[in-house]
């Protein structure tokens, strides 16, 4: 416990608080010290334990899958950060979709008009002219 106290802080006022805690710890019964140790370990390794639990759950799931099904399950190979980025982009897409749907519900005519305008703006000018009848050039009069 004293090693932990040394690593936490080098400031004198903090060191004094830590020394008091260490003295309290030393005055505890061995069973109470074990409980404190367990709580400290849980506190400092909480994230590691959560990751270990997730890994064991994924391994349990994989053990019940065939090789082909395991290959399809790519999330286990990705880090949680990568998965979070993918999920975040999906959530943003869903939010945009819901916003667009709410616009359509509030003003269906305006939404259809806006959509139609966007579609027309995407058509290239060459494509717009293809539907017009092309005029045939008049034959030049030949004079002799």
UniProtKB/Swiss-Prot annotation:
Residue spans of biased composition, Polar residues class: 125-135
Region (Disordered): 125-144
Protein name: Uncharacterized protein RP144
């Amino acid at each position: 416990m004293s090693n932990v106290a040394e690593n936490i802080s080098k400031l004198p006022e903090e060191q004094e608080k830590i020394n008091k805690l260490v003295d309290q710890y030393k005055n505890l019964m061995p069973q109470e010290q074990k409980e404190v140790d367990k709580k400290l370990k849980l506190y400092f390794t909480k994230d590691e334990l959560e990751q270990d639990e997730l890994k064991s759950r994924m391994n349990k799931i994989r053990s019940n899958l065939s090789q082909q099904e395991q290959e399809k399950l790519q999330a286990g190979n990705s880090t949680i950060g990568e998965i979070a980025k993918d999920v975040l982009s999906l959530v943003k897409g869903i939010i945009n979709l819901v916003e667009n749907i709410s616009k359509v519900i509030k003003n269906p005519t305006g939404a259809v008009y806006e959509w139609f305008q966007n579609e027309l703006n995407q058509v290239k000018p060459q494509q717009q002219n293809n539907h017009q009848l092309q005029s045939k050039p008049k034959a030049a009069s030949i004079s002799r």
